[in-house]
């Protein structure tokens, strides 16, 4: 990022000094957490899955043999991910996409026929799970798929012992923020990306 940008948290007292030097906000981003009880109530997530299943949408865990489909989904969507200096989404190549499974990530998704139209990628480390990304084909958005694949990933990781879930994104991606709030995530931190004034 160099010296062209600074990315303080919302409560950082340095923001006032940065603004006084002529830096301007060029992006906002957020982090959110979901905390489950030791004996978690997963009914909200199961209810989310039930609603889309009634609409004919089936969510399932994807095996590594679906890596090329995930790569094609990401390639179709890469231009739609908002960019900020603090929040970027880089398109993985086909080999790196396949390697997600080798690194222990789990992928929940759904298909329209043979076409993968939505997926979320999550990693669990003991009791903590972090969403890497969620991707839904443009033609399938506003159908509940994004919420459903994320709900499925939460159930899978919770059943394996995860109790704290993390995620984040750019403030410009209101749909992603809405998905996470619907599933019970709470915003825990915000960052502002400031760009230095022209010399």
Question: Over which residues does each language-model region extend?
Answer:
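Conserved glycine-rich acetyl-CoA-binding loop
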Residues: 137-148, 160, 172-175
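Ligand-binding pocket scaffold of soluble enzyme catalytic domains
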Residues: 23, 30-39, 56-62, 66-72, ...
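Acyl-donor-binding surface of acyltransferase catalytic domains
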Residues: 1-61, 194-196
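Conserved GNAT acetyl-CoA-binding A-motif
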Residues: 1-8, 157-169
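Short amphipathic alpha-helix that is part of the acyltransferase structural core
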Residues: 46-89
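A conserved beta-strand-loop-helix scaffold within acyl/acetyltransferase catalytic domains
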Residues: 78-138
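Acyl-donor binding region in acyl/amide transferases
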Residues: 1-17, 131, 139-152
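Conserved active-site alpha-helix within GNAT-family acetyltransferase domains
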Residues: 9-28, 147, 171-189
């Amino acid at each position: 990022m160099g010296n062209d940008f600074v990315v303080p948290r919302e409560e950082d007292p340095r923001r006032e000094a940065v603004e006084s030097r002529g830096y301007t906000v060029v992006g906002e981003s957020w982090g959110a957490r979901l905390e489950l009880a030791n004996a978690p109530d997963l009914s909200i997530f199961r209810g989310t899955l039930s609603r889309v299943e009634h609409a004919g949408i089936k969510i399932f865990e994807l095996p590594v043999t679906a890596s090329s489909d995930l790569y094609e989904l990401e390639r179709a969507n890469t231009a739609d991910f908002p960019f900020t200096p603090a929040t970027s989404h880089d398109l993985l190549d086909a080999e790196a996409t396949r390697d997600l499974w080798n690194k222990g990530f789990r992928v929940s998704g759904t298909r329209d026929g043979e076409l993968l139209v939505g997926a979320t990628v999550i990693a669990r480390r003991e009791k903590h799970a972090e969403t890497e990304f969620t991707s839904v084909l443009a033609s399938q958005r506003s159908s509940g798929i994004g919420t459903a694949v994320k709900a499925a990933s939460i159930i899978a990781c919770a059943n394996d012992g995860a109790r704290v879930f993390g995620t984040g994104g750019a403030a410009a991606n209101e749909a992603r923020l809405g998905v996470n709030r619907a599933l019970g995530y709470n915003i825990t931190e915000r960052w502002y990306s400031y760009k230095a004034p022209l010399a």
